[in-house]
Every structure is written in structure tokens, then in C-alpha cells.
């Protein structure tokens, strides 16, 4: 299982939101490039980055930061947040970003998603943010009313290979993750990256037992509740 340490960008700083609330912001590092280097030095194999300004406003105001992070580290990077057209996808891929994560764009416009999957294949990841079993869009602000597991099945039928699934109610709460929903999705034919509330060794161990492809860990690392090096070691030893 791959541990994806998370860098969430807001105003060019590395932050974490609680439950996706832009009014509950905690700055963990004002230098995201330095943070990315720390994660790489601790053994991270893949970095997860989200442009929160982009997710909310559809802009890419943190583009320069993403570029500098890409130039500073050698591990693969996946980037999401406000990517709603092919031009943004192309720009990020040209920059050397390995995977581009679509959220709102995928939920709102399935023909567009199909076109991007046909064109860019496994470089496209879809992020499904769910609240009480329903898909949420626009930086977690709107509820689409779409059943999240049914939507995942639809994405698989379209050829999607990798999915980030976030349980919004759990995100940034340090209360553990929604293992029951991950169990359902893990039975489907898709690489699941679990996100939201991964804050205890127990969560990681349970996700490992389910043969989960990956887990995004953010606040728990910054707050010191989990040690990134230990998590990576646990996963490496489990996979042997």
C-alpha cells in the first residue's frame, strides 16, 4: 500500500482544513517546497497535492508553487483542485505532474471525463468526495445528491483505474476513517486511495488488510499523531 502524504495549498502555504471548512484553516508550513522535501527525505514514494484555492474558485493561483515542488523532488506527484478543463490538465502534465485529479469536473460533466480518460488514460484520477453517502462537489460546498458507491461503479465502467475517495465527515477530525465504505469500494475493480480521517495506526492496518492501493495522510502527520517513516515501513513490511 502506498502512503500519500498530503500537501494542501492555500495562498501558497501548506495548510489543513477541518471538514473542508475554509474558515477552519491551520497553517502547517509556510514553505510547501520545504515540506515536500521533508516528506521525500522520510521515504515517501508518492506526493498528494491539492490546490484549495483552485478547488473553491476554479483558479490555479498556486501553479508556481506546484512547479517549484515538482522541480525540487524526484518522487511522483498527483495534483488536484480546480482542474476543470483540458488546458489545466495539459499544463500540469507538461510540468511533469504524474497524475491529475478531477473532482467537480468529473461529477458535473461525464462526457468530458470520458474524453480525458480516453486521451490520458491512467494519468487521470477521479476524486469522489462524499458526505453521508452522497457525492459533494465544488470544494465540498455543494451536495450533488448522487449515491457515491453507484457513482464509483459508473466511473469503473468508463475505464477509470484510480480513485481517491474522501469521507468529508471524517476529514481533519482525527477520529478515524470510514472503513465500512472502503470495504465496499475495495471489492470493486479499481485502485482505491482512501482519504479522510486516516489518523491512527489502526486505520492503516485495517486498510492494509483490505488490500487497499493507497491512503492519503495529512493532518495526523502534521499533528504528530502518526509518523510517516513508521507508516511507510509498516506498509513495506506488510507487502513482503
Residue ranges and their predicted role:
Residues 12-14, 19-23, 90, 97-171:
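Conserved anion-binding
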Residues 73, 77-99, 180-214:
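Catalytic cores of alpha/beta
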Residues 1-3, 43-46, 73-77, 97-98, ...:
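Short, well-ordered coil/turn segments that N-cap beta-strands
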Residues 48-51, 78, 101-102, 125, ...:
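Conserved beta-strand positions in the central sheet of alpha/beta enzyme cores
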Residues 8, 39, 47, 92, ...:
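Conserved, mostly hydrophobic/aromatic
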Residues 28-40, 84-90, 144-154, 204:
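Short, acidic/polar
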Residues 14-60:
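N-terminal beta-alpha supersecondary unit
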Residues 3, 54-70, 84-90, 104-125, ...:
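Active-site-adjacent beta->alpha loops and helix N-cap segments on the catalytic face
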